[in-house]
């Protein structure tokens, strides 16, 4: 009593406290960073190693395996995957959430150093690592085009200057430059000219390497001067290499230009990049796992004027893709939704109280509570994101509830003629415990979320804490500022009989009278109501089992990502044509704004594309509808497939799959994996629940096997090392020397000129110089035959792995897809040597599915414990919790009605409903218990009177929560697909709960009261007719 009086009778102090909360909140709001979702990125590090010319199997066994054994000893590694292709190995390390990325990077470097002695010689450089997830979509893509500069020169400028500058921006984790490669001097050998001159390929390589050296020469000095010695020991251009003498034939000098074409070109000619219809160099920028995407993008944009200033006039630098506009638009939509929710809630209060002064009180209390929450968010290190702003939107209905309960009770005393200050004090005292019970039990709902681990726990933590803080501030405001404003602003009202003449008041009175009549009938037919209650419990269980489920709603971020997979024997020239054809099909779609792509590198038959759609307001279709439309057109392209998927704000795992979800096959036997993977993939492709089924197992590439006749080789004076060196020199794009320039280092690349390697007959032109100096054709000691070979070898842990990726057809949920896959695997009878499991997002979904029911039960149990402590009773909490089944039925039916799967967002809605709907029961039970204690009423009379007296605040709080969530349901702008499931769940649950709990709660209250009396061996009081 004195606590409430302290604030009621000291209005200046109370106002200043509220002002301080508001000012701190405004400051926190201005300092809060902006993000699409809470920070949930796993720490990921990518290790890269190269050995040009080495086969995928060689890379896997000699490079990947030693590194994996060393890296696998690092603490905190959640998953380790590797992919080895022609001349390249990439290992992805995904760490636990609590692992510091900088400490992990130090451990990775130490592991690389430890494995160095086990790696093969001939590697052009040591393995390197980068702190970025290659499977993440770039946050920004910049393109460089030029009419006069070559692609190699553009690539050199981009990688040497632009990429280095961008990498220094805070938040940038990796700048991947694609579309070409660094400049190089390429030596294209003529096999016939070499044979005629009697020059081996090794001799050419050694001559080039010896002619281009960079060694210190020292200095000469006398008593006065010192001269540094400098020589022309380096060759830097193709023109300087051409006259190089590599051999003497009968006293005549054989120069490099006599047996080879020497050109200024690039290290790897099998690379191509495009933006729309023009050749381009792409700078694909990814953020650090812990970085904020908006702050990082803003930092890059702020740097663009400086970048453009350093670019020559012949180069055009453009932003091809930027993830931030849709994120900003989505957050703006949420902020507008929040404003609409506040307005609707205030409107509900006005319609019920029919007083401008009374409405002003919650109109002040709600903003103070919401704005004050921003200060706590900043102190907790949170961000303004879709989930935290959705929490505040939903909190609008919660924070007004506390004010409504206090305000309505004070207004009731004023209508009875009590003086304002006395009414404020008395009314607050009567409902103070009720408000505290409602708030504490509501916060208790979120305790299990705060203790939840893994990705879902990290994702929901900001939501739970933000909402809990808003409720806590609301509790303080409703017990201090609200009664003070009531005492000083409101006046004694007209008698209720006069208010009934007004429109809304007359409707409310009519509803209350109708409710009273129907409640009398219900209390005389309790068994029927009991059957209905048990029916809702059973229906909850059936609906939860039957409803389709998914992990997270499919977002429309306005960005698509596509992976091209062509025939495994395709050439680079043909693959570049496929890239152009696919880009033309996509560019012609009316919903597409920009498209970029690249192909080449170690995987000739693959490519990547990034598509930016037009803003949501400029296109009629969602991203998924655009994909469905393009899928039909793209399927007509022969010899290759393009798999499109909408970029999501949450992507789990480090695999670069060509679809959103993955199922991984593991085996210790590579042969068993290669036998069963095609069978499983074929069976999964036939499932209607899956779309775009594809695999990263590529073991059908064209290969030419050379079989050495070792006896013949020994007789001819040739060893295997010389033969292998011949092949590497001829066909491996071998980097044989380094050119040092002030800004970068470039390579000299040697191979047989592509003009002489158009078919297999090129092998017949190869020869080896034996120990006697004679040229021995390769065909003398080797036979060759075509065969199939892998284009890549994949590992997970230390086991051979193959990942089958898939998308979901429109109207199919992830739970339906995973159930179909599990069923198919059982039907196929896959042997135990081949193990299958979901990975990435699908794996997290499986884990979340297993914990959802536990989480709901834990929330209910926590609320029960809190209510039991507050009421000092085992029974009354059960009465209050009896409101939950009807809310669950309403929520699940609403999701089914809107064809929305049960997702993590819908789970949040269910958790919120646990907190919302029990408020009705708390208000009923509190007044019933007080009436029994102080008024001497029977349980039947007490609960009946409580239901009628609390009908108006129950309607007000329910409608306030409903109207607070309604804008989430009706929103259709950017990010609406994320907000709608939450609104649908809450609105559906509130409607059904309001219809049923007004009747089931009194019946359950009486049931438990009679049960209590029976167990305490007391005679029940006779039922009093109402």
From Swiss-Prot:
Membrane-topology annotation of the record: Multi-pass membrane protein
Signal peptide: none
Pfam family, one: ACR_tran
InterPro entries, alphabetized: AcrB_DN_DC_subdom, Acrflvin-R, Multidrug-R_MdtC
Subcellular location: Cell inner membrane
Transmembrane feature ranges: 15-35, 333-353, 360-380, 387-407, 431-451, 463-483, 528-548, 853-873, 897-917, 953-973, 984-1004
A Gene Ontology molecular function term of the record: xenobiotic transmembrane transporter activity
One term under GO cellular component: plasma membrane
UniProt keywords, alphabetically: Cell inner membrane, Cell membrane, Membrane, Transmembrane, Transmembrane helix, Transport
Family per record: Belongs to the resistance-nodulation-cell division (RND) (TC 2.A.6) family. MdtC subfamily.
Listed PANTHER family: MULTIDRUG RESISTANCE PROTEIN MDTC (PTHR32063:SF34), PTHR32063
Assembly and oligomerization: Part of a tripartite efflux system composed of MdtA, MdtB and MdtC. MdtC forms a heteromultimer with MdtB.
Protein name: Multidrug resistance protein MdtC
């Amino acid at each position: 009593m004195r606590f409430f009086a302290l604030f009621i009778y000291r209005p200046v102090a109370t106002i200043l406290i509220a002002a301080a909360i508001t000012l701190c909140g405004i400051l926190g709001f201005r300092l809060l960073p902006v993000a699409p979702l809470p920070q949930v990125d796993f720490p990921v590090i990518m290790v890269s190693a190269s050995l040009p010319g080495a086969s995928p199997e060689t890379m896997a066994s000699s490079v990947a395996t030693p590194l994996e054994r060393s890296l696998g000893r690092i603490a905190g590694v959640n998953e380790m995957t590797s992919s080895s292709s022609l001349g390249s190995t990439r290992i992805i390390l995904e760490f636990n959430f609590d692992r510091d990325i900088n400490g992990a990077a130090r451990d990775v470097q130490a592991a690389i150093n430890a494995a160095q002695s086990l790696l093969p010689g001939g590697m052009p450089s040591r393995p390197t690592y980068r702190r970025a997830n290659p499977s993440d979509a770039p946050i920004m893509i910049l393109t460089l085009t030029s009419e006069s500069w070559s692609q190699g020169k553009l690539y050199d400028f981009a990688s040497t200057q632009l990429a280095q500058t961008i990498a220094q921006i805070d938040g940038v984790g990796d700048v991947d430059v694609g579309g070409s490669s660094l400049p190089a001097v390429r030596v294209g050998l003529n096999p016939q000219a070499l044979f005629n001159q009697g020059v081996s390929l090794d001799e050419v390589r050694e001559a080039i390497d010896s002619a281009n050296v960079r060694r210190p020469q020292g200095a000469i000095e006398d008593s006065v001067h010192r001269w540094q010695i400098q020589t022309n020991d380096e060759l830097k251009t193709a023109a300087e290499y051409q006259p190089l003498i590599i051999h003497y034939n009968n006293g005549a000098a054989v120069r490099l230009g006599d047996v080879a074409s020497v050109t200024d070109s690039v290290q790897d000619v099998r690379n191509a990049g495009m933006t729309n219809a023009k050749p381009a160099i792409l700078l694909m920028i990814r953020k650090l796992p812990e970085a904020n995407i908006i702050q990082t993008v803003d930092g890059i944009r702020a740097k663009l004027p400086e970048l453009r200033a350093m670019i020559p006039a012949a180069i055009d630098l453009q932003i091809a893709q930027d993830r931030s506009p849709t994120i900003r638009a989505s957050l703006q939509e949420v902020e507008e939704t929040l404003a609409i929710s506040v307005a609707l809630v205030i409107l509900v209060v006005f319609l019920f109280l029919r007083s401008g002064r009374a409405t002003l009180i919650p109109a002040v209390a709600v903003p103070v509570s919401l704005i004050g929450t921003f200060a706590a968010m900043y102190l907790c290190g949170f961000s303004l994101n879709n989930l935290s702003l959705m929490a505040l939107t939903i909190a609008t209905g919660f924070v007004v509830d506390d004010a409504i309960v206090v305000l309505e009770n004070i207004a009731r005393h004023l209508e009875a003629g009590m003086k304002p200050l006395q009414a404020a004090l008395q009314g607050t005292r009567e409902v103070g415990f009720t408000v505290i019970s409602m708030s504490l039990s509501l916060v208790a709902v979120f305790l299990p979320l705060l203790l939840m681990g893994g990705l879902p726990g990290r994702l929901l933590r900001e939501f739970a804490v933000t909402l809990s803080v808003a409720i806590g501030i609301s509790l303080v405001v409703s017990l201090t500022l609200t009664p003070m404003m009531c005492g000083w602003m409101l006046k004694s009202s007209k008698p209720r009989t006069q208010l009934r003449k007004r429109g809304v008041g007359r409707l409310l009175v009519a509803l209350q009278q109708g409710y009273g009549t129907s409640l009398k009938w219900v209390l005389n037919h309790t068994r029927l109501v009991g059957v209905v209650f048990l029916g809702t419990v059973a229906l909850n269980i059936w609906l939860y089992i039957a409803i389709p489920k998914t992990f997270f709603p499919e977002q429309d971020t306005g960005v698509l990502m596509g992976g091209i997979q062509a025939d495994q024997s395709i050439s680079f020239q043909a693959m570049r044509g496929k890239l152009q054809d696919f880009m033309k099909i996509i560019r012609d779609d009316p919903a597409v704004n920009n498209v970029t792509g690249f192909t080449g590198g170690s995987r000739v038959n693959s490519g990547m594309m990034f598509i930016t759609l037009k803003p949501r307001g400029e296109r009629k279709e969602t991203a998924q509808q655009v994909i469905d439309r393009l899928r039909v057109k793209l399927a007509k392209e022969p010899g290759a497939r393009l798999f499109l998927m909408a970029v999501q704000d949450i992507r789990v795992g480090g695999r670069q799959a060509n679809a959103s979800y993955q199922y991984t096959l593991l085996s210790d036997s590579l042969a068993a994996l290669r036998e069963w993977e095609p069978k499983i993939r074929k069976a999964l492709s036939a499932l209607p629940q899956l779309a775009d089924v594809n695999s990263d197992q590529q073991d059908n590439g064209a290969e030419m096997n050379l079989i050495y006749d070792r006896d013949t080789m020994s007789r001819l004076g040739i060893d295997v090392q010389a033969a292998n060196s011949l092949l590497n020199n001829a066909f491996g794009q071998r980097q044989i020397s380094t050119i040092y320039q002030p800004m970068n280092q470039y390579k000299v690349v040697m191979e047989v000129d592509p003009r002489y390697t158009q078919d297999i007959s090129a092998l017949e032109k190869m020869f080896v110089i034996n120990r006697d100096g004679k040229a021995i054709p390769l065909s003398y000691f080797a036979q060759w035959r075509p065969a199939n070979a892998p284009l890549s070898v994949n590992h997970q842990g230390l086991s051979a792995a193959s990942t089958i990726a898939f998308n979901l057809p429109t109207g199919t949920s992830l739970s339906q897809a995973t159930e179909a896959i599990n069923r198919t695997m059982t039907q196929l009878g896959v042997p135990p040597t081949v193990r299958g499991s979901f990975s990435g997002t699908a794996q997290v979904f499986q884990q979340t599915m297993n914990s959802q029911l536990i989480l709901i039960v834990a929330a209910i149990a926590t609320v029960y414990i809190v209510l039991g402590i507050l009421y000092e009773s085992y029974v009354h909490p059960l009465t209050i919790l009896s409101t939950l089944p009807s809310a669950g039925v309403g929520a699940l039916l609403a999701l089914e009605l809107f064809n929305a799967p049960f997702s993590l967002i819908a789970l949040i809605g269910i958790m919120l409903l646990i907190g919302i709907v029990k408020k009705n029961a708390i208000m009923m039970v509190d007044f019933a218990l007080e009436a029994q204690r102080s008024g001497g009423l029977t349980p039947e009379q007490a609960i009946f009177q409580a239901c009628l007296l609390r009908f108006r605040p129950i309607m007000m709080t329910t409608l306030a929560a409903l109207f607070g969530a309604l804008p989430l349901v009706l929103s259709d702008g950017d990010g609406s697909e994320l907000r709608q499931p939450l609104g649908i769940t809450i609105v559906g649950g509130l409607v059904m709960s309001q219809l049923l709990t007004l009747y089931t709660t009194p019946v359950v209250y009486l049931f438990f009261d009679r049960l209590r009396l029976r167990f305490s061996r007391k005679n029940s009081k006779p039922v009093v007719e109402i």
